[in-house]
């Protein structure tokens, strides 16, 4: 049974406007025409986003592999979030770029369904791995002993990936290679019922954006309260320890030292919380316009159909995949410092090993110079008595 055609949008949810990015027209009148100037700008921006996403996340994975603290829980979540961002770059940004260049999907039906499926897998994975990282930081602040005792991070990450793979299955049934005009085929979304686009876009918006943002807001609200409560208690404890040091001497100084050490540990945790909070903030800023435009386009029949608004929202959403590496660099700069040091060390070792002839010649020249200097000094020492 043929359903209602929606649209062949370049990324996973672009079902509502009726036109692909950079195109104008409607579905019933045949294939749309493209705004070439707008498409060229989009291709240039997507090339930059793809390069930054691939290079940035690859550097993060390489830095995490070479660091001495690779078994840290935070680094474990960072690794999988970088993998999810790479999935977004390869299976969302890259197909979008190719689709903008060719304007049509040139490939078999299986490839069409696979690409659309992996697009949503990356989006689900990046969202829920970020949510998992935030929950881990919440446990580390609110219940530190429990978070150390129950090391279920690997199981949680595995369950998250499996859940994302399952939740993305509808894409395989919605998208297929369809004839959109006489002799013109494209990777197209088809719904059995007219209300299908509304239901599907609303479900994706709830699952990927609204529900995670609510949970993230609750997590960081609780984290903020616990940090404020902790700092308040430490301020009171520090004041009491300072008074005790005046009265009890050494015992008071020991108590003050204990308070100072606890404050250092708390600052380390707060720093990781700040990092995850900035990542969450970047996620909200990048994805809010996209989901707003999507919901507006499917629920309001009078919504504007211009492609420029959808392209800006899509580009901003794609930008999220290359933001996270810079945030990691800002808060964990030692990772990249170690990576640069290892790179320079390996480069110097390679250059030193690739020029053995120059090395041996320099060694010989140094040794001959040393012998000549020894001989000249001995000659001077032997000639001194005779001159005297």
UniProtKB/Swiss-Prot annotation:
Cross-referenced Pfam families: 7tm_1
Keyword Glycoprotein: yes
Membrane topology: Multi-pass membrane protein
List of residues that carry Phosphoserine: 365, 367
Residue intervals annotated with topology Extracellular: 1-38, 98-113, 176-202, 294-308
Chain ranges on the Cytoplasmic side, renumbered to this chain: 64-74, 136-154, 226-274, 332-388
GO cellular component terms given for this protein: plasma membrane
Residue numbers spanned by region Disordered: 354-388
GO terms, biological process: positive regulation of blood pressure; positive regulation of cold-induced thermogenesis
Coiled coil residues, start to end: none
Subcellular location: Cell membrane
Keyword entries, A-Z: Cell membrane, Disulfide bond, G-protein coupled receptor, Glycoprotein, Membrane, Phosphoprotein, Receptor, Transducer, Transmembrane, Transmembrane helix
Main location (coarse class): membrane
Transmembrane segments: 39-63, 75-97, 114-135, 155-175, 203-225, 275-293, 309-331
InterPro entries (UniProt xref): GPCR_Rhodpsn, GPCR_Rhodpsn_7TM, Oxytocn_rcpt, Vasoprsn_rcpt
This protein's record includes keyword Phosphoprotein: yes
Amino acid composition bias (Low complexity), ranges on this chain: 365-388
Superkingdom of this protein's organism: Eukaryota
Glycosylated residues, chain numbering: 8, 26
Residue pairs linked by disulfide bridges in the UniProt entry: 112-187
An MF annotation (GO) of this entry: vasopressin receptor activity
Function: Receptor for oxytocin. The activity of this receptor is mediated by G proteins which activate a phosphatidylinositol-calcium second messenger system.
Family membership noted in the UniProt record: Belongs to the G-protein coupled receptor 1 family. Vasopressin/oxytocin receptor subfamily.
Protein name according to UniProt: Oxytocin receptor
UniProt source species: Mus musculus
């Amino acid at each position: 049974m043929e359903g209602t055609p929606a649209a062949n949008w370049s990324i996973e949810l672009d079902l509502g406007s009726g036109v692909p990015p950079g195109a104008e027209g409607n579905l019933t009148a045949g294939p749309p025409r493209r705004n070439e100037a707008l498409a060229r700008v989009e291709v240039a921006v997507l090339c930059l986003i793809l390069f930054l996403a691939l290079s940035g996340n690859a550097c993060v994975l390489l830095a995490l592999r070479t660091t001495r603290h690779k078994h840290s829980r935070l680094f474990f979540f960072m690794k999988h979030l970088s993998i999810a961002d790479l999935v977004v770059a390869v299976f969302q940004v890259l197909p979008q770029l190719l689709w903008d260049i060719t304007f049509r999907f040139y490939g078999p039906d299986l490839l069409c369904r696979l690409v659309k499926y992996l697009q949503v897998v990356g989006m689900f994975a990046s969202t829920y791995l970020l949510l998992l990282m935030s929950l881990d930081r919440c446990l580390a602040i609110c219940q530190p002993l429990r978070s150390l005792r129950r090391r279920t991070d690997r199981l949680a990450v595995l369950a998250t990936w499996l859940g994302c793979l399952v939740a993305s299955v509808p894409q395989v049934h919605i998208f297929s290679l369809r004839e959109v005009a006489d002799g013109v085929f494209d990777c197209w979304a088809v719904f059995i019922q007219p209300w299908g686009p509304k239901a599907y876009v609303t479900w994706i918006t709830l699952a990927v954006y609204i529900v995670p943002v609510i949970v993230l807001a609750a997590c960081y609200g609780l984290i903020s309260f616990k940090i404020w409560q902790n700092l308040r208690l430490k301020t009171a404890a520090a004041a009491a320890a300072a008074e005790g040091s005046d009265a009890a001497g050494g015992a008071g100084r020991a108590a003050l030292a204990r308070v100072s050490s606890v404050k250092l540990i708390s600052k380390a945790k707060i720093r990781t919380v700040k990092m995850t909070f900035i990542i969450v903030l970047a996620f909200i800023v990048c994805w809010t316009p996209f989901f707003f435009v999507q919901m507006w386009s499917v629920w309001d029949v009078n919504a504007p159909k211009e492609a420029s608004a959808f392209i800006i929202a899509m580009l901003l959403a794609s930008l999220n995949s290359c933001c996270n590496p810079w945030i990691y660099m800002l808060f964990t700069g030692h990772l990249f410092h170690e990576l640069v040091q290892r790179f320079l060390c390996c480069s110097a070792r390679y250059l030193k090993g690739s020029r053995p002839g120059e090395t041996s010649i320099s060694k010989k020249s140094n040794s001959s110079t040393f012998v000549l200097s020894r001989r000249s000094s001995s000659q001077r020492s032997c000639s001194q008595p005779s001159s005297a």
